[in-house]
Amino acid sequence: FNIDYLYGRGYYQNQSTSNFNAGIFASYIGNKYQMQAVYNNFTMKMNENGGIQDDRYITRPEDMAEGKKEYESTTIPVKLEQTSNKNKDFYVYLTHRYRLGFTRETTTVEDAKSPKRAVANDSVPLAKDTIITEEFVPVTSFIHTMKVERARHKFSSAKETEGQYPNAYFNEVASRDSTTAFSVKNVFGIALLEGFNKYAKAGLTAYISHKFSRYELMDTLSRTNFDEQEIFVGGELAKRQGKTLHYNVNGEVGIMDKALGQFRVNADLDLNFRLWKDTVNFYARGYVSNTLPSFYMRHYHSNQYYWDTENMNK
C-alpha cells in the first residue's frame, strides 16, 4: 500500500500545486499459477499565473510604481487569476499466467558433516548423504494481461481579458474546458519457455492484444464521443539465461480498425566475454515503427483551441 501527498506554495502569486497519489499492490507466486495486480490513483491540481506582467518588476523594480513601492515575490502582478489545471487518473493493472510443465528429480551428494568428528580426527573420510528433491520445470505459459484506465483533464479560468487567446470558440470571458479518456486493454499470449531442456536455447512468445478507447470532448451544444479499437498480433524471441549472449526481439503489427497499418519492432542484444583479466560488454539496440499519432494530436476541443485532423491517419 502506498499513499503520498505533496503541496507546493509557489514563489509567485497563483502558483501553488498539490499532488495526491494512492496505490495498492498484490501478488501471488506459485509453481504453476502466478499473479501480480496494482491499483493506482492520481490527482494533481496546478494553479496558473501565466507569468509576471512585466519583467521590470524583477530587473528594474525602481521603474515600477515610480519607485514608491517595494515588491515581494508574492505581490508582483501576474497575468492570470483564478486559473487552474486539474488532472485525475486511475488505472487497474492485472497480469497472470498458468504454467504447464513436468516434475523431475534432482540428486545432490553432500558430506554428512559432524563438527565433533571433524575436530576429533579430520583424517577420517566423511560419510556422504544423497539428497533427492523434486522440482517443477515449466514448459509452456498461458498469459493474460488486462489494464483499465480512466483519465480526466479540466482547465478553468474565471476571468479572461480580450485578446488573451487567439480564439474563443464557446465563451469570450471565461473557460471551463474538460475531456475524459477511458480505455480497456487485454493481451492474451502463449509462451514456450527457455531452458526447459538443453535444446530450448531461447524462449518464444506469441500474443494478440485488443484495446478499446473512448474519448469525450466538449462541443458547442453537447459533448462528443470518439470510440476507437486497436487489434495487434505480435511475438517475442528472447534469450535471457546464460552468461555470454542475451538478446530480445519483439514485434507487433496492427490488423484491424485504427491499428491497421501500424507496426513496431524493437531488439536489443548484449555480448559478454573475457579479455585478459577483465570482462568486455557489447550492447546493441534497434527500433523501427510506423504508428498513428495519439488521439489528442488528431482531435482536441477547448474554448481556445479546436482541431480535428483526420488526414493524420494517412
Regions found by a protein language model. Give the residues of each.
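Short loop/turn motifs enriched for small/polar and acidic residues
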Residues: D4, N40, K147
